[in-house]
């Protein structure tokens, strides 16, 4: 052992020197002294301590010093568990790897030693020493060799695993390493078949899990609340479960299942379906090995449900195989006992109900399953329809059909099918014996319902797969569980069923197929019925007895209570005081203990924090110093390593680098290395392409040849398959016919057997009728009395009901008569109104005709006035033209000849309207014809507008027309007919009489004179031109300029609003509201070019005139227009404003 303290580097050199001279113990002591020295253990980084630790562990493995290795590992963990976890992980993995390598080497050495001993003397294989050793210890040579050579290393490896698990159990940074080591320990137990070590390992892991579930204040503690920790623990327990099943340690497997269920319940996240499927599969296997068929079937059913719901790519064959497995496991469950409470007199441990409840929790079931509930769930999930026909028949034969004579034969056929196909039904073979037992029990129960006694010989014929000893055992078990009443007569070799009528079979109806109840069941129900009847009779005979007894008992109880109430009250108070004192004492003790523990934990944590802080400061200073020293060297080597490493990551780069040594790599730069890499890559690519082409050709030829050779084989296979299918169908059909014949014979025999019971049935019915005759007569009398009372009651009700119906009918007739009279009055009123309306219509027509005649007279006068005015205009125009020519001649006297310009000729002597007279006669005649047609259309439609004209009677009175005539023709002399814009070029200068078709007035002009109807006013240029009454003077492009022939009218001061426009001046109805001009019927006079009515009716005064010479109006006329517009704001016009 070293006598002085030395640095870690020197200690490692000295240890190597001791190893070279063959003193490993001295080397181990030297390295151990370094770890024990508190001065150096935290002063160096992992780069210095890690090689020393590897050497230390190597010596411990060589010398098998597991306790010394444990001490060093704990010291190393304390140094680097918060600084460099990877270093700690590397050290532990390296330690375990060395231990495993030495153990495997020892195993190989042990096998080699046995082989040498066996081949030592071929002539004398069994030596006297080997014979004596085998007789004394019972071991062979391999076992003895393993005990001397292999066992010490196995023990060392086991201790190494335990030390590492104990080392890492509370470190959250090494949690993954902890679970990896646990799996390595499981593999160790499997490899060397160490069952006792496996049990201790399971207990150790369970203890660690309990420790981490408790609260911990350590900074490196593992928390079970983290999802990662829960998942790691769950994976480890699943691995433990697999290992326990492989080693057939079913008790440990069951404990692992409990741990897995606890972890899944603790986890906030739902386990993945794959984990749940693995869990149910292993749980079913454990229940099967434990002989618990009920929970085994329940686990398989849960697995079937999970797989069916979540596995999307489940094939039909897999589903059928799983369904058959579940159905057969469910049907193999032994029939339950009729009185399971008898088991509690036999069980020494917990009651069966508590055990079943605990197992049900593992399956996630609210209550323990039963055979009946599982079969009901299987039927609900449609499992019998998913399996093949033979298993579907198996379910029907055991649970549905009642056929004891053929039951065992049918089940034997299913058993033979399962045993014949061992490869396909490997999972179903373990259920054969259980299925046979269930079949025998079904047979015995069905036989007991048909026969009172049966011989052993006959019963053995019905159950071919059971001998007499097994049958007798099953009969005794049935009686033991009180399932059935059976008596065995060995003298006569017979069995008697249900002979004891004083004892019932069970408290409820037996499950499965049932033909009839046992005699004991009938006796049991008879007694219950008798008790009910007697109780009712006693209550009728003595109605007050029970009430008196209850009152007496209540009085006694009250008296007894008053006697003992004070004593009981004091006793309860005293007991309560004792309990309170005990609680206070326990609470004080708990508080004191908790305060002491908290104080101790606080002191320990404070010391640990101070030590940790000091160590971290020292390590930080040491790392900072080394970092500055290593940065310069690292920068130099970094660039070259990165280039080489980048190239070495590819296969062609590795091949290229393998051709160069280190000196050659150092001589090359990055570009040269990249160039060589590219050359190598191109060469490999060419080689690969050539290989692929040759391979493609080879595969193509081979595939074609193979398919050609397969054709005759396929044809032969199809021919053989057709023959086999036909033979199979014929055999199946023959079997079906035979079964149908057998069933027919069985039904006929059954009918013949039951016919013998007809006389007994008839005798029983006659006797029963004679007994019940008196009771029938008495009930008949009561029924007649009740019938008479009910008849009287219903007759009275019918009288009241009919009286009410007659009253309702009278009221309905009276109401209908009133309604009829009101209808007659209404029809008479409507007829009167129609007659009055017709009289008003005729009156309006007469008035319209009178007004028309007046309008025609007025129109003739206006035409005469217009003609005179037109002649005055022409005369004035000629005078103006003569005056203008004279002035021009006087002006040309002094103007030079070069400046004289030919002036445009003045208007023709005929005046402004001369061109209207000279218009083409065809156009004038066409417009005259159109005016006549419009006039006729207006007269035809006049009847439809009588109502509207009637409201304008007050504006159409003759007095107003006469007043207008007295005013002179100058007032309306400006109303010259204007043509639409489309006709300006042809008839714009035509006289009003000429445009209207000569002197005959048109119907359109008549309507314009009296205002016309709404549709006539809307059909002209008022709507097309969007003219509004408040607009200023129109532009030339809208209506044209002021016409020259309009000037005289404007000078006279006449206003166009003074013209007779009765309908438009008062645009109101008789009720005082304005008419909706735009809402009138269809527009009339729609002919012509512009839709405003051509010919006589097309010359509406709103139509825009043709272009003419523009001349500004006088100021007086503009002022007069403003006055007219101002006065028109509330007048007749209904033209929209802009």
UniProtKB/Swiss-Prot annotation:
<comment type="function">
    <text>RNA-binding component of the eukaryotic translation initiation factor 3 (eIF-3) complex, which is involved in protein synthesis of a specialized repertoire of mRNAs and, together with other initiation factors, stimulates binding of mRNA and methionyl-tRNAi to the 40S ribosome. The eIF-3 complex specifically targets and initiates translation of a subset of mRNAs involved in cell proliferation.</text>
</comment>
<feature type="compositionally biased region" description="Basic and acidic residues">
    <location>
        <begin position="1003"/>
        <end position="1049"/>
    </location>
</feature>
<comment type="subunit">
    <text>Component of the eukaryotic translation initiation factor 3 (eIF-3) complex. The eIF-3 complex interacts with pix.</text>
</comment>
<keyword id="KW-0963">Cytoplasm</keyword>
<feature type="region of interest" description="Disordered">
    <location>
        <begin position="817"/>
        <end position="1138"/>
    </location>
</feature>
<dbReference type="GO" id="GO:0071540">
    <property type="term" value="C:eukaryotic translation initiation factor 3 complex, eIF3e"/>
</dbReference>
<dbReference type="Pfam" id="PF01399">
    <property type="entry name" value="PCI"/>
</dbReference>
<dbReference type="GO" id="GO:0002188">
    <property type="term" value="P:translation reinitiation"/>
</dbReference>
<protein>
    <recommendedName>
        <fullName>Eukaryotic translation initiation factor 3 subunit A</fullName>
    </recommendedName>
</protein>
<feature type="compositionally biased region" description="Basic and acidic residues">
    <location>
        <begin position="923"/>
        <end position="967"/>
    </location>
</feature>
<feature type="compositionally biased region" description="Gly residues">
    <location>
        <begin position="1082"/>
        <end position="1100"/>
    </location>
</feature>
<dbReference type="GO" id="GO:0033290">
    <property type="term" value="C:eukaryotic 48S preinitiation complex"/>
</dbReference>
<feature type="region of interest" description="Disordered">
    <location>
        <begin position="590"/>
        <end position="633"/>
    </location>
</feature>
<dbReference type="InterPro" id="IPR054711">
    <property type="entry name" value="eIF3a_PCI_TPR-like"/>
</dbReference>
<feature type="compositionally biased region" description="Basic and acidic residues">
    <location>
        <begin position="817"/>
        <end position="903"/>
    </location>
</feature>
<keyword id="KW-0694">RNA-binding</keyword>
<dbReference type="InterPro" id="IPR027512">
    <property type="entry name" value="EIF3A"/>
</dbReference>
<dbReference type="GO" id="GO:0003743">
    <property type="term" value="F:translation initiation factor activity"/>
</dbReference>
<dbReference type="GO" id="GO:0043614">
    <property type="term" value="C:multi-eIF complex"/>
</dbReference>
<dbReference type="GO" id="GO:0001732">
    <property type="term" value="P:formation of cytoplasmic translation initiation complex"/>
</dbReference>
<dbReference type="GO" id="GO:0003729">
    <property type="term" value="F:mRNA binding"/>
</dbReference>
<dbReference type="Pfam" id="PF22591">
    <property type="entry name" value="eIF3a_PCI_TPR-like"/>
</dbReference>
<dbReference type="InterPro" id="IPR000717">
    <property type="entry name" value="PCI_dom"/>
</dbReference>
<feature type="domain" description="PCI">
    <location>
        <begin position="319"/>
        <end position="502"/>
    </location>
</feature>
<dbReference type="GO" id="GO:0006446">
    <property type="term" value="P:regulation of translational initiation"/>
</dbReference>
<keyword id="KW-0396">Initiation factor</keyword>
<dbReference type="GO" id="GO:0005852">
    <property type="term" value="C:eukaryotic translation initiation factor 3 complex"/>
</dbReference>
<comment type="similarity">
    <text>Belongs to the eIF-3 subunit A family.</text>
</comment>
<feature type="compositionally biased region" description="Basic and acidic residues">
    <location>
        <begin position="1107"/>
        <end position="1128"/>
    </location>
</feature>
<dbReference type="GO" id="GO:0016282">
    <property type="term" value="C:eukaryotic 43S preinitiation complex"/>
</dbReference>
<feature type="compositionally biased region" description="Basic and acidic residues">
    <location>
        <begin position="1058"/>
        <end position="1078"/>
    </location>
</feature>
<keyword id="KW-0648">Protein biosynthesis</keyword>
<dbReference type="GO" id="GO:0071541">
    <property type="term" value="C:eukaryotic translation initiation factor 3 complex, eIF3m"/>
</dbReference>
């Amino acid at each position: 052992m070293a006598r002085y303290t030395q640095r870690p580097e020197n200690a490692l050199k000295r240890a190597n020197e001791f190893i070279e001279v063959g003193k490993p113990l001295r080397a181990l002591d030297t390295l151990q002294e370094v770890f024990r020295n508190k001065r150096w253990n935290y002063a160096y980084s992992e780069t210095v301590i890690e090689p020393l630790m590897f050497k230390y562990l190597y010596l411990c493995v060589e010398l098998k010093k597991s306790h010394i290795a444990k001490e060093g590992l704990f010291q190393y963990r304390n140094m680097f568990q918060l600084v460099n976890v990877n270093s700690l992980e590397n050290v532990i993995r390296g330690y375990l790897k060395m231990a495993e390598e030495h153990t495997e080497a020892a195993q190989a050495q042990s096998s080699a030693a046995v082989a040498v001993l066996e081949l030592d003397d071929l002539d004398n294989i069994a030596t006297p020493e080997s014979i004596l050793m085998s007789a004394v210890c019972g071991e062979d040579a391999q076992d003895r060799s393993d005990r001397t050579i292999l066992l010490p290393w196995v023990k060392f490896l086991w201790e190494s695993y335990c030390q590492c698990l104990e080392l890492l159990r509370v470190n959250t940074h090494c949690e993954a390493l902890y679970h990896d080591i646990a799996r390595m320990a499981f593999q160790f137990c499997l490899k060397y078949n160490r069952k006792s070590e496996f049990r201790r390992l399971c207990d150790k892991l369970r203890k660690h899990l309990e420790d981490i579930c408790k609260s911990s204040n350590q900074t490196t503690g593992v928390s079970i609340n983290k999802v990662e920790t829960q998942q790691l623990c769950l994976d480890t327990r699943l691995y433990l479960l697999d290992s326990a099943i492989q080693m057939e340690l079913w008790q440990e497997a069951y404990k692992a299942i409990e741990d897995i269920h606890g972890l899944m319940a603790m986890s906030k996240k739902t386990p993945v379906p794959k984990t749940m499927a693995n869990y149910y599969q292993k749980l079913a296997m454990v229940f099967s090995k434990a002989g618990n068929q009920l929970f085994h079937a329940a686990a398989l059913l849960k697995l079937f449900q999970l797989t069916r719901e979540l596995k999307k790519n489940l094939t039909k064959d897999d589903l059928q195989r799983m369904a058959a497995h579940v159905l057969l496991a469910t049907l193999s469950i032994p029939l339950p006992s009729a009185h399971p409470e008898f088991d509690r007199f036999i069980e020494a441990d917990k009651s069966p109900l508590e055990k079943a409840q605990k197992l049900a929790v593992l399956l996630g079931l609210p209550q323990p399953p039963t055979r009946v509930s599982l079969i009901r769930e299987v039927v609900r999930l449609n499992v019998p329809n998913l399996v093949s026909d033979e298993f579907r028949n198996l379910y029907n034969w055991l649970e549905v059909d009642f056929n004891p004579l053929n039951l065992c034969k049918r089940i034997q056929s299913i058993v033979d099918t399962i045993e014949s196909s061992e490869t396909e039904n490997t999972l179903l073979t373990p259920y054969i014996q259980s299925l046979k037992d269930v079949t025998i029990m079904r047979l015995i129960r069905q036989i007991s319902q048909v026969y009172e006694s049966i011989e052993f010989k006959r019963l053995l014929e019905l159950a071919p797969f059971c001998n007499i000893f097994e049958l007798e055992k099953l009969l005794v078990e049935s009686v033991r569980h009180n399932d059935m009443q059976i008596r065995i007569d060995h003298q006569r070799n017979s069995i008697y069923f249900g002979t004891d009528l004083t004892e019932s079979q069970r408290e409820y109806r037996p499950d499965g197929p049932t033909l009839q109840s046992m005699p004991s069941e009938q006796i049991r129900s008879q007694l219950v019925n008798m008790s009910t009847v007697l109780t009712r009779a006693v209550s009728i005979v003595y109605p007050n007895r029970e009430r008196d007894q209850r009152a007496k008992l209540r009085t006694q109880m009250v008296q007894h209570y008053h006697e003992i109430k004070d004593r009981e009250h004091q006793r309860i108070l005293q007991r309560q005081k004792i309990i309170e004192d005990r609680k206070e004492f326990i609470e004080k003790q708990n508080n004191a203990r908790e305060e002491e523990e908290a104080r101790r934990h606080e002191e320990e944590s404070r010391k640990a924090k101070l030590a940790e802080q000091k160590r971290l400061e020292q390590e930080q200073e040491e790392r900072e110093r080394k970092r500055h020293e290593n940065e310069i060297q690292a920068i130099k080597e970094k660039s070259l390593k990165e280039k080489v490493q980048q190239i070495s990551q590819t296969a062609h780069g590795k091949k290229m680098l393998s051709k160069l040594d280190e000196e050659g790599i150092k001589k090359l730069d990055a570009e040269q290395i990249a160039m060589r890499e590219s050359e190598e890559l191109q060469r490999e690519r060419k080689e690969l392409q050539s290989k692929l082409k040759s391979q493609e050709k080879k595969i193509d030829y081979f595939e074609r040849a193979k398919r050609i050779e397969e054709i005759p084989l396929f044809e032969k296979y199809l021919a053989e398959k057709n023959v086999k299918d036909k033979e199979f169908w014929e055999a199946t059909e023959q079997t079906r016919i035979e079964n149908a014949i057998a069933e027919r014979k069985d039904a006929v025999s059954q009918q013949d057997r039951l016919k013998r019971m007809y006389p007994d049935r008839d005798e029983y019915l006659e006797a029963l009728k004679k007994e019940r005759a008196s009771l029938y007569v008495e009930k008949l009398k009561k029924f007649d009395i009740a019938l008479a009372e009910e008849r009287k009651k219903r007759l009275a009700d019918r009288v009241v009901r009919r009286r009410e119906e007659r009253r309702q009918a009278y009221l309905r007739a009276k109401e209908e008569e009133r309604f009829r009279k009101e209808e007659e009055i209404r029809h008479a009123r409507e007829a009167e109104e129609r007659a009055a309306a017709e009289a008003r219509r005729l009156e309006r027509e007469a008035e319209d005709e009178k007004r028309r005649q007046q309008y025609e007279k007025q129109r003739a006068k206006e035409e005469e006035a217009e003609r005179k005015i037109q002649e005055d205009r022409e005369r004035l125009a000629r005078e103006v033209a003569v005056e203008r020519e004279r002035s021009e001649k006087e002006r040309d006297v002094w103007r030079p000849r070069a400046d004289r310009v030919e002036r445009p000729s003045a208007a023709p002597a005929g005046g402004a309207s001369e061109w209207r007279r000279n218009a083409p006669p065809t156009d004038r005649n066409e417009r005259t014809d159109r005016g006549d047609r419009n006039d006729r259309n207006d007269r035809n439609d006049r009847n439809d507008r009588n109502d509207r004209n009637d409201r304008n009677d007050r504006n159409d009175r003759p007095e107003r027309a006469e007043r207008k005539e007295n005013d002179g023709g100058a007032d309306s002399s400006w109303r010259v007919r204007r043509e639409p814009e489309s006709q300006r070029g042809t008839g714009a200068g035509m006289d009003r009489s000429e445009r209207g078709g000569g002197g005959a007035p048109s119907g359109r002009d008549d309507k314009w004179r009296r205002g016309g109807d709404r549709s006539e006013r809307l059909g002209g240029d008022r709507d097309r031109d969007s003219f509004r009454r408040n607009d200023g003077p129109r532009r030339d492009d809208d209506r044209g300029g002021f016409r020259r022939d309009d000037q005289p009218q404007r000078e006279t001061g006449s206003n166009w609003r003074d013209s007779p426009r009765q309908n438009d001046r008062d645009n109101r109805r008789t009720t005082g509201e304005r008419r909706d001009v735009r809402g009138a019927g269809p527009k009339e006079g729609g002919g012509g070019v512009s839709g405003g009515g051509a010919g006589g009716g097309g010359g509406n005064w709103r139509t825009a005139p043709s272009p003419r010479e523009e001349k500004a109006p006088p100021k007086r006329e503009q002022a007069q227009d403003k006055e007219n517009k101002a006065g028109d704001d509330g007048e007749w016009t209904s033209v929209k404003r802009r």
